[in-house]
Amino acid sequence: MNLQGKQVTVHDMTLRDGMHPKRHLMTLDQMKSIACGLDAAGVPLIEVTHGDGLGGSSVNYGFPAHTDEEYLGAVIPLMKQAKVSALLIPGIGTVEHLLMAKDLGVGTIRVATHCTEADVSEQHITKSRALGLDTVGFLMMAHMASPEKLVSQALLMQGYGANCIYVTDSAGYMLPDDVKARLGAVRAALKPETELGFHGHHNMAMGVANSIAAIEAGANRIDAAAAGLGAGAGNTPMEVFIAVCARMGIETGVDVFKIQDVAEDLVVPIMDHIIRIDRDSLTLGYAGVYSSFLLFAKRASVKYGVPARDILVELGRRGMVGGQEDMIEDTAMTMARERGLTLAAA
């Protein structure tokens, strides 16, 4: 397909999904420096919250270095052209969090649910739209639902007021044909004025290819992260995606070389570990496991002596989804007992 002249809005994930590999401990200075770099590179939309969205600070998901309010309050006043978004997962984030984000200047709210549970988003999507915000319905772990099921869920979110729907490959499981089938079906069912987005993970090295497949299927918003900083093997690496788009004539408005510099000079130096496709993150994609489970599985592996890869395969077999982080340790403990391993002292 000739995509020459196609316009795409690139949405940065470095400061939200990138909080997962940073264990949500990014400093305000790091956040501000990277956000300003992204802004100067021409990235139009930047997401800023705890990795699990507004209100994510908890025993279950991890305590951040600063509150969402502090992160948003530090970044938003510095932006010259970029707008700032916030993720909200019903059951974690509340309407009060949404109102706080709006008051601080957030212009886009992305309401995320598991791909078969769009009905729990009604309150938050309706409120966001009533406040005049750019309102996105975000269907996570989309590989677990058929194209037909995704269509029904997307239509619910559109009906609640979402002006954009995202099909989200949270596990980095999908291949380009999977992406085309799902986004193509959703695009055909939505109103022409409702936008369509894609969020990928690079666990099978498909982030860029899947994002291009999404554009071919009608998506006009694409998530990516500088240096791929995100859960698992990271999100679609933005600097690579932007270069590919430039080669194909897809218009993003992002400077090819400036975004490379942000990735190389600002993001890579703050990584606690190099974001790459190792055996555990590859297993996430292969087994269809939620990408942010990676560090939880690695910690459980150290504690119980069960290889992280084995834990991840079992989580995939059980069909675990986002929000069941507390079950990872339980799974590892059960596997250790079944293998006759001595459990570490509490």
Curated annotation (Swiss-Prot):
GO terms of molecular function: 2-isopropylmalate synthase activity; 4-hydroxy-2-oxovalerate aldolase activity; manganese ion binding
Binding residues annotated for Mn(2+), in chain numbering: D17, H199, H201
Gene3D superfamilies: 1.10.8.60, Aldolase class I
Enzyme Commission number(s) from the entry: 4.1.3.39
Enzyme class: lyase
Cystine residue pairs: none
PROSITE patterns the record matches: PYR_CT (PS50991)
Plastid keyword on record: no
Residues noted as binding substrate in the record, renumbered to the chain: R16, D17, S170, H199, Y290
Family indicated by similarity: Belongs to the 4-hydroxy-2-oxovalerate aldolase family.
Protein name (database record): 4-hydroxy-2-oxovalerate aldolase
Organism of provenance: Polaromonas naphthalenivorans (strain CJ2)
